[in-house]
C-alpha cells in the first residue's frame, strides 16, 4: 500500500540531492575534521561550506552558526546558555504558553535553579499580545524566547516587533524557528534576531542535526564540555555527513523558497476547501492570515482524533493529532488548551502538514478517505 504522508511538521523525507551529497562523508571522506592530513582537511572544508550555506539561508555570518544535534539541543543551549551567562545581571525570562516542549521544559529546569519565568498568554488564534509581553518585563529580565511559528497550529508570531520590544529594554531575543526555517523566508538581520534555533529534519535533511544562530557579540555558556569544536561552545567530533546534508538542504531551500512556499499554500488551500465543502461541523484552529503555508489544523466535532488517525493509517495516510512530540500524550494539547479550545474540540483535532513530495492526487486520496471515515465514525 502506498504511503500518503501529511506530517511534514513532524519530519521530512531526505531529498535525493541531500542524501547524495552526504554519502561520501560516510565512506571515502571519513576523516576527522580536527586532523591535519588531507581527508581531515577535506572534512573541515566541507563543514565550512555547510556553515556558509546555513548562514546564507537566514542572512547571517558563517561565524554566527553553531552546529548542534537537533532543534531541542539548540533551544536548550540558547536558554540555559544565556541564563547562566547573565545570572549576575538578572534571573527573569519571558516565553509563551504555546512553545515547544524543548523551551517549556528548559524553562522548568531553570525555574528549579532559581530563575523566574513568565509564560505569556496567546489569543484564540495563537497570537501573542505584545502589550502583555512588554508589561511583564522587569529590571531582572535577561531573555525573551518566543517561537517563530507554532508547530501545531502554524501561527506565525510578530517576531520583528517582539525583537524591537526586547532590544528597547536591552534584552536578548531568541526564537525557536524550527518550523519556519525552509518554509518561509527569514532574515535575522532585518528582523534583528539575536538567537535562532533550526533543525535539519524539518527541511529535508536527516534527523540528528541542527544549528543555533547567535549574533556576534552575544556571550553564552557552553552546553557540553570537552574539546574545542564549534568555537569551544559545543564539544564533540563533528557529525560531518549530517552537517554537509544540512548545508545542502539549506542551499536548496534558499534557491526555491518562494516557489516552495506557494506550492505548500496551494496544496493547503485546495485541501482545506475540499474538506470544508464535504464535511460538516469542523473548526479551523489558528489564524489563516498569519499561518505557515503548509499547515492545516482542524477539529471535528464529536470525534476522537486517536481513532481517526488509526483509521487513516489503515489506508496509508500519515497525519497527526498535534505535534509528534506530544501526540501520544493522553492529556489535551497544551497549544489547543492555551488558545481556549473546548475539550470536545481539542480531542478531535487533526493536523495535516504538506511538503515537497505531496501532490494534488495525494490530496484527492486524503479527502476521499477522510470524508468516508468521518461519516462512518459519526454514525457509529
Predicted feature locations:
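Pyridoxal 5′-phosphate
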Residues: 1-380
